[in-house]
């Protein structure tokens, strides 16, 4: 097992190990430090076949090997469960997630990831992203190799439906009202809109070259779609279900996320492995223009906002770090080492 040491020397004395997840003395973790920010952040370490857990209050990191090369992960709305998707570990790790065989969906207790998964089930080919409905009853997984979305009953741990969408679906998000899911179809330049009640695709919206992920404004009026091969972000009016404009950003935009205020969208510009991007574009949602560019680590990929809304977290795929951004100053306040090849990123609140 390979674990990563972060921020300080490995803490040897067992009495000094204070991570609340009940991990063993073999785990490498950072020296605790106090912070005004709380919550937990999880990264899908695709090259390391692991999940890293960051305690935002202490900056302690725990990295746990798992049985897949996870591309993406997501917590449930109550923060109790964590779900990860990817290819079997012996097949993945090349950052493409391009295996032909079935992928896997793993479920974890979000407070005890180091104990291993509580379930492991097959999904479709080339799984990319996973989301969970508000009730925690169903999970939705994009299967890029099947051009479909798996709908999973989490109580029965069974796939109950496969929804046909566009070519090579990748990222997906549920609208704030929970009624629709927007799916970025990387292979055909469209976004599929799924009716959550009926579990059917109701429309397919043309947006541009290689859409990777979507983000909603908190009021649900607009969806922002990263267009990797155009170095831009498309803006979709969710009422008319039409694209209304495009906003130039940095090279190879991947994930994006709105601040709780809805005033700004943070876009991670990954670039390519040969020419990595290392910036985050900040879009003003009123002017629909980039108002700041923040330097992060190489291969800025995933974006999430902390549960308290006071930090923006960026996974840096080629730097093996997470950049912690203060959205007020728009500056990186910390770079946290995690596992190898962090891609997907998610967060949850804690009671501490």
Label the predicted regions:
Residues 1-9:
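Bacterial N-terminal signal peptides that target proteins for export
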Residues 6, 13-16:
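Alpha-helical hydrophobic membrane-insertion segments
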Residues 11, 18-352:
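Predominantly soluble domains enriched in secretory-pathway, periplasmic, or organellar proteins
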């Amino acid at each position: 097992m390979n674990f990563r040491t972060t921020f300080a020397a490995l803490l040897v004395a067992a009495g000094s190990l204070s991570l609340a997840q009940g991990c063993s003395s073999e785990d490498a973790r950072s020296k605790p430090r106090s912070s005004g920010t709380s919550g937990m952040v999880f990264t899908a370490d695709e090259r390391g076949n692991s999940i890293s857990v960051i305690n935002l209050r202490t900056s302690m990191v725990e990295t746990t090997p798992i049985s897949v090369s996870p591309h993406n992960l997501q917590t449930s709305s109550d923060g109790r469960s964590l779900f990860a998707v990817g290819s079997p570990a012996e097949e993945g790790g090349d950052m493409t997630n391009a295996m032909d065989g079935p992928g896997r969906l793993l479920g974890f207790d979000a407070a005890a990831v180091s104990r291993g998964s509580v379930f492991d089930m097959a999904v479709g080919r080339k799984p990319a992203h996973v989301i969970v409905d508000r009730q925690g009853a169903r999970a939705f997984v994009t299967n890029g190799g099947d051009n479909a979305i798996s709908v999973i009953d989490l109580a029965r741990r069974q796939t109950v439906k496969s929804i046909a969408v566009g070519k090579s679906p990748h990222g997906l998000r549920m609208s704030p009202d929970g009624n629709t899911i927007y799916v970025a179809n990387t292979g055909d330049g469209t976004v599929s809109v799924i009716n959550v009640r009926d579990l059917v695709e109701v429309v397919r919206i043309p947006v541009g070259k290689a859409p990777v992920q979507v983000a909603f404004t908190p009021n649900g009026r607009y969806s922002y779609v990263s267009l990797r091969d155009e170095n831009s972000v498309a803006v979709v009016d969710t009422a008319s279900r039409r694209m209304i404009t495009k906003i130039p950003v940095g090279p190879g935009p991947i994930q994006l996320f709105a601040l709780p205020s809805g005033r700004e969208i943070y876009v991670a510009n990954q670039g390519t492995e040969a020419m990595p991007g290392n910036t985050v574009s900040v879009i003003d949602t009123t002017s629909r223009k980039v108002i700041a560019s923040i330097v992060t680590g190489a291969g800025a990929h995933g974006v999430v906002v902390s549960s308290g809304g006071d930090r923006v977290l960026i996974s840096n795929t080629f730097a093996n770090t997470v950049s912690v951004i203060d959205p007020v100053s728009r500056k990186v306040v910390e770079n946290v080492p995690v596992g190898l090849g962090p891609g997907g990123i998610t967060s949850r609140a804690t009671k501490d």
